[in-house]
Amino acid sequence: MKFENEAVQIVSDFLDASMAPDPVKAATYMSEDVRITFTGGRVMPTAKDITAFNAGRYRWVKKQLGQFDWTRHEDHTVVYSNGTLYGEWPDGSSFSGNRYLDRFEVRQGKITRMDVWNDSAEWILTPSIAKP
């Protein structure tokens, strides 16, 4: 998908690579000192760590991208991506409709910060709240 806003394009391209999953390509969109924080406050130093974390939590997972929202600041752009996750849990059962919200900071053409929130933890703890 093509976007007029450069920061949104960078985030979109990163998400495409990370969902492939291609952590090597995904890392090319991130600064060397990127700060990645996942649900539960889990800090991850690299895109490879995201792939490893997801491999432990899901058999496989993809994003159904929703809209992108962004706001420019003096030295960076904040980009929000929202939508839903779908895939399979480690036991092979499928899921969809798992809400996510990712927040990115993009500076000088690179993602410098990524914050991730989704419903996975709640769905794992209480599977009955997951809606097909």
Where are these regions (language model features)?
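Low-complexity, intrinsically disordered terminal/linker segments enriched in charged
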Residues: 113-132
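Mid-chain, well-packed structural core segment of small domains
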Residues: 69-91
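Exposed beta-sheet edge and beta->alpha loop/turn motif
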Residues: 84-108
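A solvent-exposed, acidic/Ser-Thr-rich amphipathic alpha-helical stretch
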Residues: 4, 23-77
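Hydrophobic alpha-helical core bundles mediating ligand binding, dimerization, or RNAP-core interactions
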Residues: 11, 15-18, 30, 50, ...
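Short, low-complexity N-terminal intrinsically disordered segments enriched in polar/charged residues
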Residues: 1-28, 32, 130-132
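Hydrophobic pocket/interface hotspot
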Residues: 14, 25-27, 34, 46, ...
